Each structure stands twice: as C-alpha cells, then as structure tokens.
Amino acid sequence: RKVSVNNPTLFFVRSLKDALEQAGIAVEGQAIDIDSLSKPDKKSLRQGLRTLAQHMSSPLSDIAVSMMKRSQNLYAESLLYRIGSVEGRGIHGGREGVSDLLADWGVRRPRIAVADGSGLSRYNYLTASALVDVLDVVYRDQYWQKQFIRTLPIAGRDGTLRRRFRGTAAEG
C-alpha cells in the first residue's frame, strides 16, 4: 500500500532514530525537521568534526529518469527541497526557484502555482496554455528535449506504463 509523506525530512529522521534505537544505539533528544532549526553558523558546526563517509549521488539527469518513469514522488519532493537549500531556504526557496525558471521560459504567475515537488498538492495548478508554453520551450531546445523524452515511461516497456498498452498500437 502506498501513502504520501507530508514531510519527507521529518519522516526520514524519525525512521532513522527508530532504526538506531531498535539496533541498540542510544539516541538523545527528539527527531526534528531541519527547517525547524534556526540557521546555525556553518563554520562553528564543522569544528571538531571529521568526515566518516561520503556519497556522490547519480547525475541529476539519471535521477530525473528514475523519478519520472517510476513516478517517484519522494524524489520530486526531495529535488524541490534541494533547489531551495542552495539558497538556504528549504521548500520556499525551491518553489521560488522553479517559478523563476518557468518565468525565464515565459511562464509566469498566475498561470502556474507550485506548492510541492510531486504535483500532488491541491494547491498546484498549471493552465493549459502554460503547459503548452513549457512543452514548446522543451521541444525547441535540443538539450532539454532529449533529457525530457528520456524521462518519459514507454508504453508496454518500462516505468509506470510497463504493463499497460501491451499488444496495442500504443506499445513502444
């Protein structure tokens, strides 16, 4: 059964805390969302710390393929938070970043509203003309066109459409 996660960060930290405690590792304090904290001085946070492990994620283009083909809403939410974290502004900065990109493409408010990354919020909206404008920009730019097409599930072959349209003219 699938459920939506209202706050992926808080869900993760609570799950991590629970898993650590179940493994017999004591964890002090409550699990909280980082957006609930006041912004600390990064330099003072790093004093006395050393890196234990480091992981480089896949390229964004590969993450987008997985996100779109399999409809990974948590990935979409995480990307919106990541966009916002560049400015240290969380989801609010992410919404503004997406809105700014769309404005650069000629798609401005009130024709679009970004409430979350997955598109599941009832407060997201996009007019038909705004969607056409976005698709037109993507179509005219060879880089964006190639990347976008790569992310779409193929009927009867992969992603959320892998079991649909098999044996029909729509397959492939």
Which sequence ranges carry the predicted segments?
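Active/binding-pocket-proximal capping segment
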Residues: W144-G159, G167-T168
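A small/polar active-site loop signature that marks catalytic segments
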Residues: R1-Q147
